Design a protein with these regions (language model features):
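Short aromatic-enriched loop/helix-cap "lid" or pocket-rim segments at secondary-structure transitions
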Residues: 1-3, 64-67, 91-94
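Short aromatic/basic micro-patch
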Residues: 25, 59, 120-121, 134
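Terminal hydrophobic/aromatic helix or amphipathic segment near a protein terminus
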Residues: 70-116
Length: 153
């Protein structure tokens, strides 16, 4: 997500087709709270460990991430949307010329593919056991910005 923040704030981010692609994610502090909650409640006392999926519920869409970043940064950005074929063509072209010179660039083919695929994870264990989230997406970003302001420049 830190790369997404940088891309949005530097106006290097583009939607690839569907704005509503779900991207599972969770704030690190929320993950720590959830682990502590699972250990404290010991809902499965007979088990030595509990394995669970962790994500916000529901997983935010890529558009919700971008809007939350803009909100927390107090900036209103227009984020263009391009068909994936155009972005892939650009990315492959940039990669072709940049790779021999070992130049880093923000148009990674792998990252574009990641934006297209939904990785919507349902935190079933937490839902079934009524876990109460401490942070919304915007609250998580605000807290992150407060703790790490350099990542929001």
């Amino acid at each position: 997500v830190s790369r997404l923040i940088k891309a949005v704030l530097n106006r290097c981010f583009f939607y690839v087709g569907n704005h509503n692609t779900r991207k599972a994610g969770v704030y690190v502090k929320e993950l720590c709270y959830a682990i502590g909650w699972v250990m404290e409640t010991k809902l499965n006392k007979d088990k030595r460990f509990i394995l669970f999926n962790m994500s916000m519920n529901p997983s935010p869409s890529i558009q919700e991430y971008v809007e939350a970043i803009s909100n927390v940064a107090n900036k209103n950005f227009f984020v263009p949307s391009f068909p994936k074929i155009i972005l892939f063509a650009c990315a492959y072209t940039i990669e072709f010329f940049a790779k021999p010179f070992r130049l880093n660039h923000p148009f990674s083919i792998v990252r574009i593919r990641k934006l297209i695929k939904s990785n919507n994870i349902l935190p079933t264990y937490l839902i079934k056991n009524s876990y109460q989230y401490k942070y919304s997406l915007i609250e998580a970003f605000k807290d992150w910005k407060k703790d790490c302001p350099d990542e929001w420049k």
